[in-house]
Amino acid sequence: MLRAAARFGPRLGRRLLSAAATQAVPAPNQQPEVFCNQIFINNEWHDAVSRKTFPTVNPSTGEVICQVAEGDKEDVDKAVKAARAAFQLGSPWRRMDASHRGRLLNRLADLIERDRTYLAALETLDNGKPYVISYLVDLDMVLKCLRYYAGWADKYHGKTIPIDGDFFSYTRHEPVGVCGQIIPWNFPLLMQAWKLGPALATGNVVVMKVAEQTPLTALYVANLIKEAGFPPGVVNIVPGFGPTAGAAIASHEDVDKVAFTGSTEIGRVIQVAAGSSNLKRVTLELGGKSPNIIMSDADMDWAVEQAHFALFFNQGQCCCAGSRTFVQEDIYDEFVERSVARAKSRVVGNPFDSKTEQGPQVDETQFKKILGYINTGKQEGAKLLCGGGIAADRGYFIQPTVFGDVQDGMTIAKEEIFGPVMQILKFKTIEEVVGRANNSTYGLAAAVFTKDLDKANYLSQALQAGTVWVNCYNVFGAQSPFGGYKMSGSGRELGEYGLQAYTEVKTVTVKVPQKNS
């Protein structure tokens, strides 16, 4: 995902991982020590109330890295109480200057940058993504996100309003309160930053549940939050499982807002829980089946490489992956041939190796699910052009896979696979492809490749998606909002828009003896 990766353009992958590109990347420790595996509440580390733990697994080997405290409802209750206490009127956090909140966020970014090599290695160990990507892409964007929101801390404010009569009226942007945040496993550090940045910049307090597959880096950042000087209770982090810890956050009567990134299926559950409890505010960044439209006048070399990047980046584990590649019929055969050749050349292997482009899938569940989709694609008549099998004798590695002759009604064209499986579909006209691209329950992202500005403008307006890229893919910046249409979610993250979900707007109107202009 992401701008830091996309700016390397066609050099991404093995060209990004060339000797010249990796000179600035420190050598990783392939067995980084785990320092934080408990529950973080009130700037202190705790075992779970139940004393239960769960294993976190290295997806490259299937071996257990360590045991992690398994948070449950009782632990969430403790975390919410700590957060609520930190949010009381007159508390150090509530009385803190907004500019000081910004300095704390900048300090946190500085500490993450100090420990960047360690965090990148730990992310690769726990998640499986290539270390070079962890270091150059994920950590780079974490730092930019936190520093961007640090700058907003004392600049997001209300305004005076000239209402009629002898009155003075103004608005205040006040923090929502206790914010439950549930982050996914595909970008653990980055999604943590996307959630923490706007919440803390606007003065909220946080109870965060980290994904059970990848808890280690987000927990280590908790240590840095304390070191940065955030008061106790402002950020609390609970590792655990969705049906227990996650559900406890979503249904908690003293949580004022919940932000979730993950599957549409779980997003539905969270929205129902929020509504049936205290009607807490909800923002959801959910699944996608994003159309990537290649017009016949597109730059072929660029379009092939970007379509490859759009699907295969992060082992295909991106909510906004370009997972429906629509190619105009007069260039279809050449595009397919080149895409297959590119997929066959993709380097799959040890994610700590600087030559590796693709590591393992995050866990056995995802591994089996993706292989199941590949089998379904073959059974339903899609043409398997390359890959389709297991890529290693241990770990959760899958061969880069390309299907051609994919039809809109096939399962692999409708459902989110979340793996290294490219589906290429043929179209004739621009009107046809708009209808087919929009014929989806999802609407997270889309892309268009063309040299014709009129076509680009028409398609970018016609496509039902929260983000449309033109002649590029996966270009992100902390300044630009991201979120979905339809069943891809509600609300926006990043940019100034990302602050709106974390504030209440209060109107204050004062009677004055006489109003003058």
Swiss-Prot record:
Q: Where N6-acetyllysine occurs along the chain?
A: K52, K73, K78, K159, K368, K383, K426, K428, K451
- Ligand binding (NAD(+)): G262, S263, T264, E265, I266, G267
Range annotated as the organelle transit peptide: 1-17
Q: Which reaction does it catalyse?
A: an aldehyde + NAD(+) + H2O = a carboxylate + NADH + 2 H(+)
Protein keywords:
Acetylation, Mitochondrion, NAD, Oxidoreductase, Transit peptide, Ubl conjugation
The molecular function terms of the Gene Ontology recorded here are: aldehyde dehydrogenase (NAD+) activity; carboxylesterase activity; phenylacetaldehyde dehydrogenase (NAD+) activity
| Short sequence motif named SIFI-degron, residue ranges | 9-24
One GO process term, biological-process aspect: nitroglycerin metabolic process
Question: Can you say where in the cell this protein is located?
Answer: Mitochondrion matrix
Locate the site labelled Transition state stabilizer.
N186
Catalytic residues of the enzyme: E285 (proton acceptor), C319 (nucleophile)
* Entry PTM: In response to mitochondrial stress, the precursor protein is ubiquitinated by the SIFI complex in the cytoplasm before mitochondrial import, leading to its degradation. Within the SIFI complex, UBR4 initiates ubiquitin chain that are further elongated or branched by KCMF1.
Recorded hits in InterPro entries, A to Z, give:
Ald_DH/histidinol_DH, Ald_DH_C, Ald_DH_CS_CYS, Ald_DH_CS_GLU, Ald_DH_N, Aldehyde_DH_dom
Report the superkingdom from the record.
Answer: Eukaryota
Provide one Gene Ontology cellular component: mitochondrion
Where the protein is mainly located, per its record? Answer: mitochondrion
Enzyme class, spelled out = oxidoreductase
Quaternary data: Homotetramer.
- What this chain does, per the record? Required for clearance of cellular formaldehyde, a cytotoxic and carcinogenic metabolite that induces DNA damage.
Instruction: Please give the family membership noted in the entry.
Output: Belongs to the aldehyde dehydrogenase family.
Q: What PANTHER family does this protein's entry cite?
A: ALDEHYDE DEHYDROGENASE-RELATED
Its recorded name reads: Aldehyde dehydrogenase, mitochondrial
The gene coding this protein: ALDH2
